[in-house]
Amino acid sequence: MPNLLEKTRKITSILQRSVDSLDAELPYNTMAAQLADIIDCNACIINGGGNLLGYAMKYKTNTNRVEEFFETKQFPDYYVKSASRVYDTEANLSVDNDLSIFPVETKENFQDGITTIAPIYGGGMRLGTFIIWRNDKEFSDDDLILVEIASTVVGIQLLNLQTENLEENIRKQTAVTMAINTLSYSEMKAVAAILGELDGLEGRLTASVIADRIGITRSVIVNALRKLESAGIIESRSLGMKGTYLKVINEGIFDKLKEYN
């Protein structure tokens, strides 16, 4: 049976691995599963707004309402507000506690249900909450040491996620700005008309039709599309006589165009 040191090493080793795809609906599912396995419990990670980032159900709780939280990926406001007022780990909360993960209607079925809440901090900010629970067995002192370490590790990963998201947004904004600055007045006019033709972020268009409607040459539209594609703003594919298929992959172009209108 792994001892405390071995379990601690397993948790800290999580920092050496990346989270699931940041585009995934639950980017921290794998991490939650690893922590649940190490601490021997059910676990979930929510951000400051109560959005579910990842969870692992090692043991069946038979609570439909809790499982609904996981399906909608959003915890109720009253619970999020209560959890946000927890500044230090609250351990071994009974089913009668307001912070218990076990709904009131199932108290009789899980009279020995235990919940532990740990705040997640990173860079001096509250980033979320780490929630673990068991159907009966209390969390020992060793378990709680692991919880403290786990919440710190999750905090570091959440901070990394925020940094990566910020860097990605800056990269996209920079790409849009540089692309816009290379466009002539006519090309800017063409881009606005092209994006207005799309059904959301993608669609089919005919360059000659757009050119005739806004009073520019087809070559202007072709040049504008080429510049946007080389900047990673759009993807395009010729459909032959049917026109061109277009997909926007950097949505920042829409906001940038509004600034020029």
Swiss-Prot record:
Family the entry assigns: Belongs to the CodY family.
Annotated localization: Cytoplasm
Any GO BP: negative regulation of DNA-templated transcription
Keywords: Cytoplasm, DNA-binding, Repressor, Transcription, Transcription regulation
Region of interest (GAF domain), ranges: 1-159
Primary residence: cytoplasm
Biological role stated in the UniProt entry: DNA-binding global transcriptional regulator which is involved in the adaptive response to starvation and acts by directly or indirectly controlling the expression of numerous genes in response to nutrient availability. During rapid exponential growth, CodY is highly active and represses genes whose products allow adaptation to nutrient depletion.
GO CC terms of this entry: cytoplasm
DNA-binding region, residue intervals: 207-226
Coiled coil: none
Pfam families: CodY, HTH_CodY
NCBIfam families: codY_Gpos, PRK04158.1
SUPFAM superfamilies: Winged helix' DNA-binding domain
Protein name: Global transcriptional regulator CodY
A molecular-function term among this protein's GO annotations: DNA binding
HAMAP family according to UniProt: HTH_type_CodY
Database matches in InterPro entries: ArsR-like_HTH, CodY, GAF-like_dom_sf, GTP_trans_reg_CodY_C, Transc_reg_CodY_N, WH-like_DNA-bd_sf, WH_DNA-bd_sf
PANTHER family: GLOBAL TRANSCRIPTIONAL REGULATOR CODY, GTP-SENSING TRANSCRIPTIONAL PLEIOTROPIC REPRESSOR CODY
Disulfide bonds: none
